[in-house]
């Protein structure tokens, strides 16, 4: 049997004291218990939850059995429950690719390993490997509108309340808010997102579409923006699926392969007031190709490695060093700053986690046991 949580032990002793016949009024119970939980691996899931399971309401019964689900207190874990509309759930091959993006991440752990273990829960739909008992199909709705309200309603009806502190919730849907956006994460960071590359807007989603969009939206939950630490999109030195240039087609590697994860390098910044074409992305661009915007609004992509000179202003040469160019196409002149995403993930968005932050637990007044007075009144 697992050790009982401390709060349960306190309530039990109070109840025993009451039943022992004390006529003194019980001391008022403080209404909030704040616990700074130990989180050795920094994934926002306290060691106690990852070791013993999570008891959401302090009744001594584990509600989310984290160790049985594969959690490790010394390695970063992410849990994602996936609900889905008919035909929209990603394939097993796509889910395998998502897992691989995280398992191969350049993130170190206290147990000496690298990578993040992502636990995807599709219920029974994709076999035991992706079944943690939570994911399920929901009614088809080709337009979640308004998206936040309708997503929250589906979450409330299809996601166990006790999971809120552990699992991110996502939905494989069709479209939302009358538009054709590929997805939505509602907040940065957050605990909820939707992937909406469905039939209504003729996405004809492939595994690539689903993998790129899932990883992108989850990235918002993990604190990442379209420019890394800022919202500037299409920065050629930001080699991440968080960049719209690479969400659906992958980050382009110079060896011809594609990468479907978050950036693991931070190439040199580019000053659009006087970008140095001869420098390309600098030495950290060697393993990549990249894309940027020309003055005519069209996207151009390097044919070779991005540490080579790049024609940022699209005038046919790669020798300009003092000519302004709007390289990310946003009609402003900025310094384009990249980010190493993996070094900047925020765990514990929304309601997820206890982590190193003091966490307000359920008020003890809501866990109130039967009082002696009430017990006597029953007879
Ligand atoms: Ca942890
Ligand atoms: Ca962990
Ligand atoms: Ca040029
Ligand atoms: Ca610009
Ligand atoms: Zn986005």
Regions found by a protein language model. Name each.
Residues 1-28:
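Secretory targeting and sorting signals
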Residues 29-39, 72, 76, 81-239, ...:
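Active-site-proximal segment of zinc-dependent metalloprotease catalytic domains
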Residues 40-48, 58-64, 316-320, 331-333:
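Glycine-aliphatic tripeptides that mark coil-to-beta-strand junctions in extracellular
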Residues 262:
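Acidic (Asp/Glu-rich) catalytic motifs at the cytosolic membrane interface
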Residues 45, 53-71, 108-112:
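Short mixed-charge
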């Amino acid at each position: 049997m697992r050790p009982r949580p401390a709060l349960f032990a306190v309530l039990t002793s109070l109840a025993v004291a009451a039943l022992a016949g004390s006529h003194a009024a019980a001391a008022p119970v403080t209404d909030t218990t704040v616990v700074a939980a130990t989180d050795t691996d920094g994934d926002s899931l306290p060691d106690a939850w990852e070791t013993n399971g999570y008891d959401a309401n302090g009744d001594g019964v584990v509600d989310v059995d984290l160790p049985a689900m594969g959690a490790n207190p010394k390695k970063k874990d992410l849990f994602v429950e996936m609900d889905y509309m008919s035909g929209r759930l990603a394939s097993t091959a796509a889910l395998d690719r998502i897992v691989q993006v995280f398992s191969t991440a350049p993130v170190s752990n206290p147990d000496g390993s690298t990578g993040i273990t992502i636990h995807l829960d599709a219920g029974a739909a994709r076999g035991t490997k992706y079944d943690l008992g939570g994911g399920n199909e929901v009614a088809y709705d080709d337009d979640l509108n308004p998206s936040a309200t309708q997503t929250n309603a589906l979450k409330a009806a299809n996601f166990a309340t006790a999971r809120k502190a552990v699992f991110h919730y996502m939905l494989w849907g069709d479209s939302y808010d009358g538009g054709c956006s590929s997805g939505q994460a509602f907040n940065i960071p957050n605990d909820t997102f939707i992937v909406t590359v469905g039939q209504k807007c003729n996405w004809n989603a492939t595994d690539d579409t689903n993998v790129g969009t899932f990883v992108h939206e989850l990235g918002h939950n993990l604190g990442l923006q379209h420019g890394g630490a800022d919202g500037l999109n299409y920065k050629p030195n930001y080699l991440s699926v968080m960049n719209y240039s690479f969400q659906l087609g992958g980050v382009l590697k110079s060896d011809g392969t594609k990468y479907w994860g978050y950036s693991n390098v931070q190439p040199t910044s580019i000053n659009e007031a006087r970008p140095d074409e001869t420098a390309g992305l600098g030495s950290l661009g060697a393993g990549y190709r990249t894309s940027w915007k020309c003055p005519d609004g069209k996207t151009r992509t390097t044919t070779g490695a991005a540490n080579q000179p790049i024609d940022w202003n699209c005038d046919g040469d790669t020798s300009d060093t003092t000519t302004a160019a709007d390289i990310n196409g946003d009609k402003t002149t900025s310094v384009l700053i990249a980010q190493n995403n993996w070094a900047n993930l925020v765990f514990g968005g929304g309601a997820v986690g206890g982590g190193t932050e003091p966490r307000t637990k359920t008020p003890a007044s809501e866990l109130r046991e039967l009082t002696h007075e009430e017990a006597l009144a029953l007879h």
